[in-house]
Every structure is written in C-alpha cells, then in structure tokens.
C-alpha cells in the first residue's frame, strides 16, 4: 500500500470475518475468478478481502456494519467479527491469478494456529498455493519458557516430536527454532523457488538463528 500498489487478502483455510473498516472492499464470492473480474472493473479500492463465503459449520454471518469485535488478530491486529469465513483451494487461487488486477500484491493466509503461539502442521497442512513467490513463517516468541502444552501450542504432540521435547516440558529457544526450521515444521510444503521469510512476534528474546534457512527475518516486539 505504501508503494501505491493494491493488496488482495484471502485464505486457503478459514479466517475470522474482517470488520468493515479493515479493508476498502470485502467480497463474498464462491468463484474467485469472478471476484477478480469485479475488482478489475472497480477503482474505489486499494485493499480488498475476498472469501468464498461463510463457514456453514459456524454461526450465521452477521452484517458488516456490526460493531461487536473479537480481540484483534494477534499477528496483524486486524479487527474481526465473530464469524468464520471460508477461503479457496490452493489450485483455484493459482488459476485465478491470471485475472488479478494490475499492480496488485496478494497476501494469502495458508495455515492457522487457533490462536496458539506456536504450531506444527498436520498431514494436510499447510495449504500453500504452488504458484506463490514468497512465504512468511510466523511464530510467537512468548511460547519460550512456557510448558509445551495447549492452549499455548497447537498440535502439541507434533510440536513435541519436532522440538525433541516431551509434552509439558519447557520450550527452550533451541527447541523453538528446531520446530520453525524443521522440514515437517515451519518449512513444510514451501514452494522450492519461493522467498522464505520469518516473522517473529512476542516479547524480545534471543533465539539461535540458522544461517541459510530464511532469506529475511523480521521481529515485531509486543
């Protein structure tokens, strides 16, 4: 946005419905290609959220003017409403990119942690489109020094195996980075030519970096 480009946000999983002020436009469209054609025809937006629709397993979607928010998203502090929205299959996103408006960047949420500080992916995760040219791995350093257990850790059994710890053991900086840099952890299913970024949130602390794993590292201190 700061460079004058447009941004489209979507997901391959489920997200909380962004509140009205989070984006210039929000489109609910089962067909992503049709949604992009609509965006091409409009000039009244710089940021847009595009989702397939409401999650039928969740409560009925509320109106966008609703003012009852959940806590803001823990990573980007985006205000959200208490309704889950469905995204698109990774292949559908890659197919639809041919219809993307010009001078437009995409942000695609491809995995979720159910509000936990750290997670490891299950067999079907993460759902990263093969066509993306960059992937950002996100983890919260506040899990360091805490027991390896729910609710701080999502899929703790898998995290424990990758970290080399037992369930309930204290998460160390070394174990934290083992999960993030493991081929079945933070590096799972990354497209081979994609730029690899690491975003560390939470309280500042020293973590051992492994050279050559990520192309860039950014910290956001809470």
Q: What positions do the PLM features span?
A:
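N-terminal phosphate/diphosphate-binding loop that engages ATP/GTP or pyrophosphate donors
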Residues: 2-60
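Conserved catalytic-core segment of NTP-binding enzymes
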Residues: 14, 28, 82-105, 110-221
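Short acidic, gly/pro-rich beta-turn/loop elements at beta-sheet edges
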Residues: 19, 74, 208
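Ligand-binding beta-strand-loop-alpha-helix segment within the catalytic cores
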Residues: 35-88, 95, 101-104
């Amino acid at each position: 946005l700061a460079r004058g480009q447009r941004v489209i946000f979507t997901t391959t999983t489920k997200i909380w419905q962004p509140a009205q002020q989070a984006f210039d436009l929000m489109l609910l469209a089962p067909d992503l290609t049709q949604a992009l054609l609509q965006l091409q025809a409009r000039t009244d937006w710089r940021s847009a959220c595009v989702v397939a629709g409401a999650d039928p397993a969740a409560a009925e979607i509320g109106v966008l003017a609703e003012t009852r928010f959940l806590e803001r998203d823990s990573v980007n502090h985006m205000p959200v409403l208490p309704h889950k929205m469905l995204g698109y299959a990774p292949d559908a996103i890659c197919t639809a990119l041919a219809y993307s408006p010009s001078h437009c960047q995409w942000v695609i949420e491809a995995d979720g942690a159910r509000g936990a500080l750290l997670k490891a992916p299950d067999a079907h995760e993460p759902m990263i489109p093969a066509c993306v040219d960059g992937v950002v791995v996100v983890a919260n350093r506040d899990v360091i020094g805490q027991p390896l257990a729910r609710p701080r850790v999502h899929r703790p059994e898998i995290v424990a195996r990758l970290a080399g710890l037992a369930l309930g053991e204290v998460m160390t900086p070394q174990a934290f980075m083992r999960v993030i840099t493991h081929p079945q952890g933070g590096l799972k299913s990354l497209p081979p030519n994609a730029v690899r970024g690491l975003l560390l949130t939470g309280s500042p602390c020293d973590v051992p970096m492994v050279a050559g794993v990520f192309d860039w590292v950014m910290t956001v201190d809470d």
